[in-house]
C-alpha cells in the first residue's frame, strides 16, 4: 500500500529508503527486501493518477520488454506489483549512479575507458537488435553503473522502447532532443538507426565532455539539429583513427549513410569479438594449443599468427578475471607467450626480408611493364614506400597504412587487368603485399596487447578507471 504524507510509499516485502531520482511520472527509491537475504533493489514507483494513455502504453511496453530479457548490460526487472495508488517496478540496484554524472564529475573520459564502456553498450544494443527492439531514448542519464569500484554499464529506462524490425518506420516523436537523431525532428519519420546516432552522441560526450549539439537555448538547439552541417570532431584530445572513424560514421545526419548495425558491431574500435567475457580465457587457451603445435612443427609464421591471436583474447581475459591469484597466473602465462612470440617474430622477419629480396626482380619487371599505366605505377610506388617504412624501426603503423592504401588501388586494377604476363605479375605482387600487411597488422596488435597487459600488471581495470578519470 502507499503510505500517507511525503515519505516513500509502503510496499509489502520491502523497506523503501532514499530517493534515487524522479521523472515525469515516476520516482525511484532504493529499497531492501525484508527476506533473510536483505537484497538491495531499486523500486520505480509510478503514480497511477499521473498516467495518461501514452504513458500507460510506455509503461506496459517497458514491463513487457524487460520481463522477457536477461543481459549483463541491461538492468534486470525482478518483479512488478501494484496497489490502488502506484505501480511498482522492482529493478536491479546499480550503486554507481548514471553515466552522465560519471562523465561530468571527471570532465572527460580517456579513450580506453570510453572504449570499454562502448563495448558494453554495443553488446546490449546487439542483444536488443537481434530481438527487433529499439530503445529510442539512449542517453547517459539512462545508462547506470553497477558500482564505482568495478563499473559495468547497465542500459535502463525502456519507457520509449519499441519492437521494431529494421525496416519499420515510426512517426511519433520520442527521446531527448540532445541525443535525438536529426531525422526524428526534421522528417518526423525514423527507424531503428536512430539508436546508432544516439550511441555516437554518448561517445562524443564521453570523449569531449558535452554532446555535439550542446546549446544555451532551445532555439539554438533546434537550429543545430536542423542544420545540414557535418558534425566536426574537436582536435583535442587526440584520439585513435579507428575511434574518430567510428564517431564520424555514427554521427552521420543522413540515416542511409550512417553506419549499419552490423558494421557498428564489427567495427575494429568496438571489437565485440574481444570484449572481456567468461569465454575470453578459453578462446585464448585454445589458440595457444594450436600455436604450440605449429611451433613444434617448425611453422614459425603460423605459430606467430596464432600466438598473436591468443594475446588478443588474453588481455580481455585479464580484464574479466576478478580473482587476484588467477589473474597473476594468467599474467605469467601471457609473459611466456609474448617472449616466444618475440623470438618467432625475429625468425619470421628474417625470412620475410629474404622473400622480399627474392621478389625484387619480378617487382622491377612489373614496374617496367606499368610505365604506360600511371595509376598502376603510382600504386606500386606507394607499396615501395610501405616496404621502406617497414624496414625503418618503429614504422609498423605507417607502413601498414601505406600497404592498405596501395592494396586498395591494386585490387581494383587487378580486377580490370586483361589476361597476360602483367596480370600474372600483378597477382603475385598483390598476394605478397597482402601477406606483408597481415603480418604487420599482427605485429601492431601484439604490441598493443603487450602494452595493455603491462598496464594491467601494474593496476587492475577499476584502479585504471579511477586514477585516469579522477580530476586532480
UniProtKB/Swiss-Prot annotation:
Could you list the residue ranges forming a coiled coil in this record?
A: none
Q: Report the locations given in the UniProt record.
A: Cytoplasm
User: Protein kinase domain: from which residue to which, for each copy?
Assistant: 14-270
Q: What is the effect of changing residue 139 to R?
A: Loss of kinase activity. Does not promote GLI1 nuclear localization
Q: Which InterPro entries match?
A: Atg1-like, Kinase-like_dom_sf, MIT_dom, MIT_dom_sf, Prot_kinase_dom, Protein_kinase_ATP_BS, Ser/Thr_kinase_AS
What upregulates or represses it? Up-regulated during senescence.
Q: Which UniProt keywords apply?
A: ATP-binding, Autophagy, Cytoplasm, Kinase, Nucleotide-binding, Phosphoprotein, Repeat, Serine/threonine-protein kinase, Transferase
Looking up SUPFAM superfamilies in the UniProt record yields: MIT domain, Protein kinase-like (PK-like)
What this protein catalyses is: L-seryl-[protein] + ATP = O-phospho-L-seryl-[protein] + ADP + H(+); L-threonyl-[protein] + ATP = O-phospho-L-threonyl-[protein] + ADP + H(+)
Q: How does it assemble?
A: Interacts (via protein kinase domain) with SUFU.
Report the protein's function.
Answer: Serine/threonine protein kinase that acts as a regulator of Sonic hedgehog (SHH) signaling and autophagy. Acts as a negative regulator of SHH signaling in the absence of SHH ligand: interacts with SUFU, thereby inactivating the protein kinase activity and preventing phosphorylation of GLI proteins (GLI1, GLI2 and/or GLI3). Positively regulates SHH signaling in the presence of SHH: dissociates from SUFU, autophosphorylates and mediates phosphorylation of GLI2, activating it and promoting its nuclear translocation.
Q: What is this protein called?
A: Serine/threonine-protein kinase ULK3
Q: Which organism was this protein described from?
A: Homo sapiens (Human)
